[in-house]
Structures are given as structure tokens and as C-alpha cells.
């Protein structure tokens, strides 16, 4: 999955961008925080699974 697709999926599920630090977007929802790196490439599967678990989507 591309990084921008992941970002769009999280935003669709209620996550908002709290801040951007370089190429890392920090998203928040209900006091939870997750970081999505935006490098223009596919997100590695291990990192993708971790972000989806943190977001409650897996």
C-alpha cells in the first residue's frame, strides 16, 4: 500500500493530522497517536500492520 493511500484511509476513519515533522505525519484520534512516514513509496508490510493495529483497523 502506498503511503498516501494509507494516509487517506486513516483520514477516512476519523484520524486527523496533528503535525508534520519532516516527512512524518503524526495523526491523532481519541487521544491515540500514530506516525505515517511519507516517502513516496510502498509502506513496508511490518510497518503497515503496526500502523493499522494502532489505528484499530486490523
Where are these regions (language model features)?
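Arg/Lys-rich, often Gly-containing low-complexity segments of ribosomal proteins
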Residues: 20-24
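C-terminal structural segments of small proteins and small subunits
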Residues: 4-5, 11-16, 26-58
Amino acid at each position: 500500500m502506498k503511503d498516501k493511500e494509507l494516509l487517506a484511509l486513516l483520514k477516512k476513519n476519523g484520524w486527523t493530522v496533528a503535525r508534520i515533522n519532516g516527512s512524518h505525519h503524526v495523526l491523532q484520534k481519541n487521544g491515540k497517536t500514530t506516525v505515517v512516514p511519507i516517502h513516496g513509496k510502498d509502506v513496508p508490510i511490518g510497518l503497515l500492520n503496526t500502523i493499522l493495529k494502532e489505528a484499530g483497523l486490523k
